UniProtKB/Swiss-Prot annotation:
Pfam families membership: Trp_dioxygenase (PF03301)
SUPFAM superfamilies for this protein: Indolic compounds 2,3-dioxygenase-like
Positions that bind substrate: F57, I58, I59, T60, H61, R128, T328
Lineage: Eukaryota, Metazoa, Ecdysozoa, Arthropoda, Hexapoda
Source species of the chain: Drosophila mojavensis (Fruit fly)
Family annotation (PANTHER family): TRYPTOPHAN 2,3-DIOXYGENASE
Record-given protein name: Tryptophan 2,3-dioxygenase
Required co-factors: heme
Biochemical pathway: Amino-acid degradation; L-tryptophan degradation via kynurenine pathway; L-kynurenine from L-tryptophan: step 1/2; Pigment biosynthesis; ommochrome biosynthesis
Amino acid sequence: MSCPYASNGNEHDDGAIPLSNEVGKIYGEYLMLDKLLDAQCMLSMEDKRPVHDEHLFIITHQAYELWFKQIIFEFDSIRDMLDAEVIDETKTLEIVKRLNRVVLILKLLVDQVPILETMTPLDFMDFRKYLAPASGFQSLQFRLIENKLGVLTEQRVKYNQKYTDVFGNDKKALHAIRDSEDSPSLLTLVQRWLERTPGLEEDGFNFWAKFQQSVDQFLAAQVQSAMLEPVERAKNYRLMDIEKRREVYRSIFDPAVHDALVKRGDRRFSHRALQGAIMITFYRDEPRFSQPHQLLTLLMDIDSLITKWRYNHVIMVQRMIGSQQLGTGGSSGYQYLRSTLSDRYKVFLDLFNLSTFLIPREAIPPLDETIRRKLIHKSV
């Protein structure tokens, strides 16, 4: 195979130096294609009853695992960059670039599911017996992705056993799992980063106090407007709706209420990190907050795409084996997979819910000159 980027396009150039071991590794050697392309062992073939679609099944899942490896590689580098007291603008730009790369990979993985769906349930049944006790639940790399992202052990849906039990006595796998659980996750590091958002300082701009004041004024104006409603029933409905909104805001302004929601699993961020996320959302048009806002958006994209991938997987499993059969690894199959679509598996849940706490643009506290100067010279 010729590479158009490594030649002038003339494959018969007499002056060209032939590729050899003296020049360096050739394409196949560099990519170790002899190992990669020889790693498809069809069990149906070994049983002398070859099933054509088993090859597709193997290739698709191997492709998933290769992309999982790249996602882990990107996550590890991003975690290293975030694990610092100060993150300058250059690093933030690189983090955004690598998160965007993960987003594009996940889009590719979501689009890969329909290829597997070209196989009919009957085709799958022809070789499904060879898969047991293998199961997608045993994908070590996907578990590492979840842990490095920030899926908490206590948030996981259990099916008859702890999620690590499927790795048995595989010391290498168990060590990798423990290391991913003990190391700071992307969620933890993003939380620390948000807690340092400039403008949260009580002896400085004190965004949180100004935001509370703006919310109080906004709700007071809403009450005043509702009181002018001529129809009593409509007025009472509007006042009731305003009180509900007041309770929603109370859940972020009262630290005790927020901490209770975190303990219950309904929120992920610390109280101060949530403040930072809200501030970045409000002032995303400010140059200093532009990249941080992109970063938060990409984290939501990653969560969304993983959920989409899970959903596509659930639908495919239901099409292939129905909703009553057990999975090949002994899990509850469709029922278990469907349970992973809940918010408990959404790592950056708080970012999705930020829109709940928005106020009209004109009510957002204006930045004063002091904080503007600070944002010019301070990295987030």
